Structure formats: C-alpha cells, structure tokens
Amino acid sequence: MGATALRKVSIFGATGSIGQNTIDLIARDPDAYDVVALSGGANIAQLAADARRLRADVAVTAFPERLHDLRAALAGSGVEAAAGPAALVEAGARPADWVMSAIVGAAGLAPGLAALKQGATLALANKETLVCAGALVLETARRHGARLLPVDSEHSAVFQALVGEDMEAVERIVITASGGAFRDWPLERLASATAEQAAQHPNWDMGQRITIDSASMFNKALEVIETREFFGIDPDRIEVIVHPESMVHALVGFRDGALMAHLGAPDMRHAIGYALHWPERRDLPVARLDLAALGQLNFRAPDDARYPALRLARWVMARGGLSGAVFNAAKERALDHFIAGRIGFLDMAGLVEAVLDRFEADPGLIDAPMTLDTVTQTDHLARQRVDAAMAKRAG
C-alpha cells in the first residue's frame, strides 16, 4: 500500500488573524500537508518565518516595494519570493487542493478566482469576494468543478445547520452580531469615537480594520450580503440580531417552527478547522462551552440609528449588479479616512451612501456585465469618488 498523498494547501492572507489561526492548525499536523503558497502584506518577518517553517513553495507579499526584503528574509531557504497583484494571481493558479482566502478587502477577489479556476476548494474568509462579485464567483466555481466553503463564523454556522436539510424548508437565517466596541455607548457619544477605541473588540481577537468594521457594523452588512449570495436566500428572510456574548454564531429557522442554533466559543479555529477538515469533524484545540458557567445568553434587535450600514446593505441587495463592489470599495476607503483621523466615526456611513447615490444617478455603471475587469474598475472608481467627496468637504 502506497503512502497517502500530502494535501496541497495555500494560504492567502497568512500573516493576518485568520491566516495565523490556519497556520496554527496546519502546523499541528505538518506531515499531512504540502504548503504551496503563503501570502502576506507588510509583515515580511512573519511571512518569511512561516514560509520557512512550513517549507512553502512560494511566499508572496502584496507590496512590490518589499520584494527585496522578502528575498533577503528567505535567503537560503529554497522558498521562492514574489510580490504584487500579478504574483498573487499566479500563486492562486498553482495547483492546490485547498486554498484559504483571507486577504482583507477586494484584493482577495483575483487570487480567489484563480484558485477556483484550477478546481481548488476555496475556504472563503474574505467576505468581499462574494459581496463584490457573487455571481461571477459562483459561476466560476460551477464551471470549473470547484467548491466554496464558508469560514466566517456566521456562515460556517449556517452551513453546518443546513447539513442534510432542504433549502426549500428554510424560513429564515439569523446571523448574530456582537454589536462591536460601541454597542452600549450613548448615541450622542459616537460622534467623538476614535479609531483606537473602535479597534477594541469585546469578544473577538481580530485585526484593526475588521474590528472597526464590527463597531460600525459594516462588517455585518457585508455578511448579510454574503449570506444572500452563499445560500441563495431572499434578502427579506435574512435577519441580524445583536448577541453580546458571541456564543451563538447563527440560527436557521425552518417552516415547521424549529430554530437550529450553532454555539461555540468565539475562536475562529472552529470555522477554519471545519472548512479544513470538511466533510469530517476532527479534534480542534478550542475551548468547550460550559453552559452552566455561562449562565445566560442575551439578544436584542439592532438599532438602525446606531448601525446605518445594515440599511445600506438592504439597498445593495435590492439593487444588485455591481452595487456590492461600490459599497465595499466606498466602505474601505471611508475606513481609511476614519483611521487617518480625517472624518468621524458617524461620517463613514454618510460618505458610503453619498457614493452609492452618485453611482445610482448613472445606472449604466452599476448595470455593466460582471467580470473581473468591471468589478476592478468599479472598485477603483468608487474609491476615487470617496476621495472626491472628501476633497469637496475640505474645500
């Protein structure tokens, strides 16, 4: 009997929170995996150290100006160094069985599509991929016999609750939200909230940008759109509930009145491990819930005045086309301006809505055929329009 073939894996966004948790799981069983590609951003030391430890074929930094540093850090390791958007796509096109897509933002779309085109299972932690180009991504997966598995904790929870179920029997999907750093702040205080304050998540250990998106609930707005794309459910049947403990990740309601809930400690290794080992379940190094110690779980409806991003997500789902790409790009650029201290916390939603309104005034842009090029062009234009709106404010 021959030896079992190693499973070829790639991790895009390897130096971020999701990527590091994925590496943690893979490193516990290194003899089972052949690491093809790792990608990261500016943290060259971490990227190089992980590439050496996992003996990756190639390590890619998103920043071309850091290629020299990456090559120096990998000297003598036998790991190839590459940099820039084209290198990310080339790495995604390298044959792999399983690919983690954890690059933050729209930059994850092109390498994700490349992975699908070579038939890989794409573990999707990059929610922007479906928000910006859901129809394109799903059609690419279908055409090439590839598979998409959710890694967001909410969508993984829904996916697990639906095992063996008929989507026709699903009445509603409920995704939970912690409410973020400001969930209990008085509304009048939000205008003075800083990026540093927004980056303090009460439950999850995540990067700065996604933690701020949690505070504004732009993160949840993206997840609502992703739920529609991933599960093909009518937007009117997707609900959001604020759940401060972050122990219930999602619920699925059925037409017989049953409500199936998925519970687990707030540890992303749950969802990552499920996607990594699917369709099996294997032991994971995560805390087990002690319900008696937990005592109680709390839920409340989100406040529309506090979280206008949810209303904008509903508009995007109703509008369709390339509006998701506009929404995401405008959100990302508005977040840049908030982090830089140029706008207030409450200004982000207004800026995003203004850009959506401007695109709606020229519907030919939103209704253009969805291709990688049109998504990319729309993304760039939306960012430019955010900057133009900022310049107008300053003038």
Curated annotation (Swiss-Prot):
Cofactor: Mg(2+); Mn(2+)
Positions that bind NADPH: 15-18, 41, 43, 126, 128, 207
GO molecular function, one term: 1-deoxy-D-xylulose-5-phosphate reductoisomerase activity
InterPro entries, A to Z: DXP_reductoisomerase (IPR003821), DXP_reductoisomerase_C (IPR013644), DXP_reductoisomerase_N (IPR013512), DXPR_C (IPR026877), DXPR_C_sf (IPR036169), NAD(P)-bd_dom_sf (IPR036291)
A Pfam family the protein falls into: DXPR_C
Keywords: Isoprene biosynthesis, Manganese, Metal-binding, NADP, Oxidoreductase
Pathway terms, separated by semicolons: Isoprenoid biosynthesis; isopentenyl diphosphate biosynthesis via DXP pathway; isopentenyl diphosphate from 1-deoxy-D-xylulose 5-phosphate: step 1/6
Record-annotated membrane-spanning stretches: none
Binding sites annotated in the UniProt record for Mn(2+): 152, 154, 223
Positions contributing to 1-deoxy-D-xylulose 5-phosphate binding: 127, 153-154, 178, 201, 214, 219-220, 223
Top-level taxon of origin: Bacteria
Catalysed reactions, semicolon-separated: 2-C-methyl-D-erythritol 4-phosphate + NADP(+) = 1-deoxy-D-xylulose 5-phosphate + NADPH + H(+)
EC number: 1.1.1.267
Enzyme class: oxidoreductase
GO process terms (BP): isopentenyl diphosphate biosynthetic process, methylerythritol 4-phosphate pathway involved in terpenoid biosynthetic process
Role this protein plays: Catalyzes the NADPH-dependent rearrangement and reduction of 1-deoxy-D-xylulose-5-phosphate (DXP) to 2-C-methyl-D-erythritol 4-phosphate (MEP).
UniProt xrefs under HAMAP family: DXP_reductoisom
Family according to the record: Belongs to the DXR family.
NCBIfam families tied to this protein: Dxr
Name used for this protein in its record: 1-deoxy-D-xylulose 5-phosphate reductoisomerase
Organism: Ruegeria pomeroyi (strain ATCC 700808 / DSM 15171 / DSS-3) (Silicibacter pomeroyi)
Source taxonomy: Bacteria, Pseudomonadati, Pseudomonadota, Alphaproteobacteria, Rhodobacterales
